[in-house]
Protein backbone atom coordinates (compact mmCIF):
# COMPACT_ATOMS: atom_id res chain seq x y z
CA UNK A 1 0.00 0.00 0.00
CA UNK A 2 2.86 2.40 0.79
CA UNK A 3 4.38 1.67 -2.63
CA UNK A 4 1.08 2.41 -4.37
CA UNK A 5 0.69 5.66 -2.42
CA UNK A 6 4.26 6.70 -3.26
CA UNK A 7 3.78 5.92 -6.96
CA UNK A 8 0.50 7.88 -7.00
CA UNK A 9 2.20 10.88 -5.37
CA UNK A 10 5.07 10.78 -7.85
CA UNK A 11 2.69 10.52 -10.82
CA UNK A 12 0.45 13.31 -9.52
CA UNK A 13 3.47 15.57 -8.95
CA UNK A 14 4.76 14.86 -12.43
CA UNK A 15 1.56 16.09 -14.07
CA UNK A 16 0.58 12.72 -15.51
CA UNK A 17 -2.99 13.26 -14.38
CA UNK A 18 -5.27 16.10 -15.49
CA UNK A 19 -6.07 19.13 -13.43
CA UNK A 20 -4.52 22.07 -15.23
CA UNK A 21 -1.42 23.04 -17.06
CA UNK A 22 1.98 21.72 -16.19
CA UNK A 23 4.26 24.17 -14.36
CA UNK A 24 5.29 27.00 -16.66
CA UNK A 25 2.78 25.86 -19.26
CA UNK A 26 5.17 23.30 -20.70
CA UNK A 27 3.94 20.15 -22.37
CA UNK A 28 3.74 17.33 -19.84
CA UNK A 29 4.73 14.59 -22.18
CA UNK A 30 8.10 14.36 -23.89
CA UNK A 31 6.29 13.36 -27.08
CA UNK A 32 4.38 16.69 -27.01
CA UNK A 33 7.62 18.65 -26.67
CA UNK A 34 9.20 16.72 -29.52
CA UNK A 35 6.09 17.10 -31.68
CA UNK A 36 5.99 20.88 -31.17
CA UNK A 37 9.73 21.25 -31.82
CA UNK A 38 9.36 19.25 -35.04
CA UNK A 39 6.42 21.44 -36.16
CA UNK A 40 8.73 24.52 -36.29
CA UNK A 41 5.89 26.93 -35.55
CA UNK A 42 5.85 30.34 -37.22
CA UNK A 43 5.37 33.57 -35.27
CA UNK A 44 1.71 34.28 -36.13
CA UNK A 45 2.17 37.95 -37.05
CA UNK A 46 3.70 38.89 -40.39
CA UNK A 47 7.21 40.31 -40.11
CA UNK A 48 7.77 39.46 -36.43
CA UNK A 49 10.88 37.46 -35.57
CA UNK A 50 11.07 35.05 -32.64
CA UNK A 51 13.73 37.19 -30.94
CA UNK A 52 11.33 40.18 -31.05
CA UNK A 53 8.73 38.43 -28.87
CA UNK A 54 8.12 39.46 -25.27
CA UNK A 55 7.02 36.38 -23.35
CA UNK A 56 3.69 37.40 -21.76
CA UNK A 57 2.74 33.81 -20.96
CA UNK A 58 1.85 33.44 -17.28
CA UNK A 59 1.90 37.23 -16.69
CA UNK A 60 -0.25 38.44 -13.81
CA UNK A 61 -3.72 39.76 -14.62
CA UNK A 62 -6.43 41.37 -12.50
CA UNK A 63 -8.17 39.27 -9.90
CA UNK A 64 -5.15 37.01 -9.38
CA UNK A 65 -5.55 35.46 -12.82
CA UNK A 66 -2.67 34.37 -15.05
CA UNK A 67 -2.33 35.08 -18.76
CA UNK A 68 -1.94 31.71 -20.48
CA UNK A 69 -1.22 33.15 -23.91
CA UNK A 70 1.25 35.25 -25.86
CA UNK A 71 0.40 38.84 -26.79
CA UNK A 72 2.18 39.97 -29.95
CA UNK A 73 2.04 43.76 -30.23
CA UNK A 74 1.78 45.06 -33.79
CA UNK A 75 0.19 47.83 -35.83
CA UNK A 76 -3.52 47.52 -36.44
CA UNK A 77 -4.07 45.80 -39.78
CA UNK A 78 -0.83 43.77 -39.75
CA UNK A 79 -1.54 40.29 -41.18
CA UNK A 80 -2.19 37.53 -38.63
CA UNK A 81 -0.99 34.24 -40.08
CA UNK A 82 -1.34 30.58 -39.22
CA UNK A 83 1.48 29.36 -36.98
CA UNK A 84 1.11 25.82 -38.34
CA UNK A 85 -0.74 23.71 -40.88
CA UNK A 86 -4.25 22.78 -39.82
CA UNK A 87 -7.98 23.19 -40.27
CA UNK A 88 -10.02 26.25 -39.29
CA UNK A 89 -12.34 24.80 -36.67
CA UNK A 90 -14.21 27.90 -35.53
CA UNK A 91 -14.57 31.55 -36.53
CA UNK A 92 -16.48 33.53 -33.94
CA UNK A 93 -16.91 36.78 -32.07
CA UNK A 94 -17.21 37.04 -28.30
CA UNK A 95 -16.92 39.66 -25.55
CA UNK A 96 -13.47 38.58 -24.35
CA UNK A 97 -11.58 37.67 -27.51
CA UNK A 98 -13.50 39.80 -29.97
CA UNK A 99 -13.01 38.38 -33.45
CA UNK A 100 -11.38 34.96 -33.04
CA UNK A 101 -10.17 32.01 -35.09
CA UNK A 102 -9.41 28.50 -33.87
CA UNK A 103 -7.14 26.27 -35.97
CA UNK A 104 -6.67 22.58 -35.07
CA UNK A 105 -3.49 20.91 -36.30
CA UNK A 106 -3.87 17.99 -38.70
CA UNK A 107 -3.11 15.37 -36.05
CA UNK A 108 -5.61 16.93 -33.63
CA UNK A 109 -2.98 17.30 -30.95
CA UNK A 110 -3.01 21.09 -30.54
CA UNK A 111 -5.41 24.00 -31.01
CA UNK A 112 -4.15 27.44 -32.03
CA UNK A 113 -6.36 30.33 -30.83
CA UNK A 114 -6.06 33.77 -32.43
CA UNK A 115 -7.99 36.64 -30.78
CA UNK A 116 -8.62 40.41 -30.92
CA UNK A 117 -8.56 40.36 -34.73
CA UNK A 118 -9.55 43.58 -36.49
CA UNK A 119 -10.76 41.68 -39.56
CA UNK A 120 -10.89 38.13 -40.88
CA UNK A 121 -9.03 37.23 -44.05
CA UNK A 122 -11.22 37.43 -47.13
CA UNK A 123 -12.88 34.08 -47.83
CA UNK A 124 -11.78 32.44 -44.55
CA UNK A 125 -14.27 29.75 -43.57
CA UNK A 126 -14.72 26.98 -41.02
CA UNK A 127 -13.44 23.63 -42.29
CA UNK A 128 -10.84 25.32 -44.51
CA UNK A 129 -7.36 23.79 -44.58
CA UNK A 130 -4.62 26.33 -43.92
CA UNK A 131 -0.87 26.13 -44.23
CA UNK A 132 1.77 27.76 -42.12
CA UNK A 133 1.89 31.42 -43.16
CA UNK A 134 -1.65 31.62 -44.60
CA UNK A 135 -3.44 34.78 -43.56
CA UNK A 136 -6.26 34.37 -41.02
CA UNK A 137 -7.01 38.03 -40.36
CA UNK A 138 -5.41 41.24 -39.17
CA UNK A 139 -4.16 42.50 -35.81
CA UNK A 140 -6.73 44.52 -33.90
CA UNK A 141 -8.11 45.30 -30.47
CA UNK A 142 -11.59 43.76 -30.47
CA UNK A 143 -13.14 42.14 -27.42
CA UNK A 144 -11.73 43.16 -24.06
CA UNK A 145 -8.44 44.46 -25.52
CA UNK A 146 -7.27 48.03 -24.94
CA UNK A 147 -8.36 49.99 -28.02
CA UNK A 148 -5.03 51.85 -28.00
CA UNK A 149 -2.89 48.70 -27.87
CA UNK A 150 -3.64 46.53 -30.90
CA UNK A 151 -2.16 43.06 -30.60
CA UNK A 152 -2.68 39.40 -31.38
CA UNK A 153 -3.62 37.25 -28.41
CA UNK A 154 -2.23 33.84 -29.42
CA UNK A 155 -2.88 30.75 -27.33
CA UNK A 156 -1.67 27.20 -27.85
CA UNK A 157 -3.83 24.49 -26.25
CA UNK A 158 -3.69 20.73 -26.12
CA UNK A 159 -6.58 19.23 -28.08
CA UNK A 160 -8.87 17.99 -25.29
CA UNK A 161 -11.32 15.64 -27.04
CA UNK A 162 -13.80 15.61 -29.91
CA UNK A 163 -16.59 17.23 -27.86
CA UNK A 164 -14.54 19.84 -26.02
CA UNK A 165 -11.57 20.27 -28.35
CA UNK A 166 -11.06 23.91 -27.30
CA UNK A 167 -10.84 23.16 -23.56
CA UNK A 168 -7.36 21.61 -23.39
CA UNK A 169 -4.51 22.71 -21.17
CA UNK A 170 -2.59 25.79 -22.33
CA UNK A 171 1.05 25.48 -23.38
CA UNK A 172 3.57 28.31 -23.55
CA UNK A 173 4.12 28.70 -27.32
CA UNK A 174 7.24 30.87 -27.11
CA UNK A 175 9.86 28.07 -27.11
CA UNK A 176 8.27 26.54 -30.22
CA UNK A 177 7.89 29.71 -32.33
CA UNK A 178 11.12 29.40 -34.29
CA UNK A 179 10.22 30.85 -37.70
CA UNK A 180 9.81 34.55 -38.53
CA UNK A 181 6.24 35.49 -39.39
CA UNK A 182 6.13 35.35 -43.18
CA UNK A 183 2.79 35.69 -44.98
CA UNK A 184 2.46 33.28 -47.90
Question: Predicted regions span which residues?
Answer:
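Positively charged n-region of N-terminal signal peptides that target proteins for export
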Residues: 1-3
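Bacterial N-terminal signal peptides
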Residues: 5-14
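Surface-exposed, glycine-biased beta-strand/turn segments
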Residues: 16-99, 132, 141, 170-184
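Generic beta-structure capping elements
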Residues: 56, 75, 106, 117, ...
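Solvent-exposed loop/turn segments at secondary-structure junctions
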Residues: 59-60, 78-79, 93-96, 107-110, ...
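Zn2+-dependent peptidoglycan hydrolase active-site motif and core
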Residues: 83-126, 149-153
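Conserved, short, structured surface segments that act as functional micro-motifs
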Residues: 102, 110, 128-184
Amino acid sequence: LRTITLVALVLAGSGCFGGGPAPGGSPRVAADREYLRDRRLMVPVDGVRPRDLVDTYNAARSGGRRHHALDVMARRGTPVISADDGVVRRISTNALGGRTVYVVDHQQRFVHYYAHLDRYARGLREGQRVRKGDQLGTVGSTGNADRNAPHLHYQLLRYANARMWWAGDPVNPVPYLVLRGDKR
